[in-house]
Amino acid sequence: MKKIQYFTIITDTREQKPYTFQNIKPEPPAVIRQGLKTGDYSVVGLESKITIERKSLSDLFGSAGKGRKRLESEFQRMNKFDYAAILIESSLSDIFVNPPGRSKMNPKAVFRTLISWSVKYNVCVWPCWSRDAAERVCYLILNNYYNNYYNLKG
């Protein structure tokens, strides 16, 4: 059995509300702040292999509306990674039932954009029911990718 290796998470320096990963058990991972060309989170040594972008519900609606070209460019850049994901700090039902109050975007249009671009650019979209859940999912994705990449555990 191979010894479990610990990894270091990179948080992009532009990330305004970074995850701390302090509630991860049994031990929080090491985290550093470093500029990433794409995404908000990656793993030291695997920056060109895996990327994760975090979006709050209001970020998502803003990006799908006025920031549409920038959002599609982000999907295009993410397509170059072995694994790329967008984590939404909200449930799928919230996209439809509780869209941001000031948004003029049709929730169906936002949802269809996510589906269309996730397929076109091979980017996973993970709606999570809360910010805490999204932080946990972010950790689990990075941890699983790291372990699979280095063949550390089955």
Where are these regions (language model features)?
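Non-catalytic C-terminal interaction segments of nucleic acid-processing enzymes
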Residues: M1-E47, D59-G154
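Conserved catalytic cores of phosphodiester-cleaving nucleases, focusing on short active-site segments
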Residues: I50-S56
